[in-house]
A protein has these predicted regions:
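Extended, low-hydrophobicity segments enriched in charged/polar residues
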Residues: 1-87
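Alpha-helical oligomerization segments
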Residues: 107-153
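Amphipathic protein-protein interaction modules
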Residues: 70-122
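Generic detector of leucine side chains in alpha-helical contexts
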Residues: 34, 41, 70-71, 78, ...
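N-terminal low-complexity, intrinsically disordered segments
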Residues: 2, 12-16, 88-105, 141-153
Length: 153
């Protein structure tokens, strides 16, 4: 189910998305939304104090500038710190992973979801976390805005 499909009437009325009402933000989880996965993921790495973070340069206004990482269609600033630093960025990191590469978190700037790759135990712990809304997906699943076949136009 895609958020823009089930909320289209509200969007057409000119009402802006509002995080204070629980509406999701594209590509940038809030500090509160990052705390729960951080608490789970820290248990599935041996290097929680050594993590890499990539933040999209297009957010603008950021003071967190580091080395640049170039991926197809996206440019990021790279920084390094503890897993708990994921919640402290001016703009939430779009990619982050520990030094031991036990898992990787990815939030595409144009989507409402965050994806995590990790061991079966790690993913199961995320699925079991009451503070998170988590669904299991496979690498073959479409994740673009038009992937919703239930609420299509």
């Amino acid at each position: 189910m895609e958020w823009h499909r089930i909320t289209r009437p509200a969007a057409r009325s000119g009402r802006a998305w509002d995080r204070s009402r629980g509406e999701p933000s594209e590509g940038e989880p809030s500090e509160d939304e990052l705390r729960a996965p951080v608490s789970v993921l820290r248990r599935f790495t041996e290097t929680p104090e050594q993590c890499w973070f990539c933040s999209w340069v297009g957010f603008g206004g950021t003071t967190e500038r580091g080395a640049e990482v170039l991926l197809p269609g996206r440019e990021y600033f790279l920084s390094y710190g503890a897993i708990t630093d994921a919640t402290t960025f001016e703009n939430a990191p779009n990619l982050w992973w520990p030094k031991d590469r036990a898992w990787c978190v990815a939030t595409e700037i144009d989507l409402l979801a965050t994806y995590v790759g990790g061991s079966r135990d790690c993913i199961q712990a995320l699925l079991d976390a009451e503070a998170l809304e988590v669904f299991s997906v496979s690498v073959e699943d479409r994740v673009d805005a038009d992937a919703d076949t239930i609420n299509s136009e």
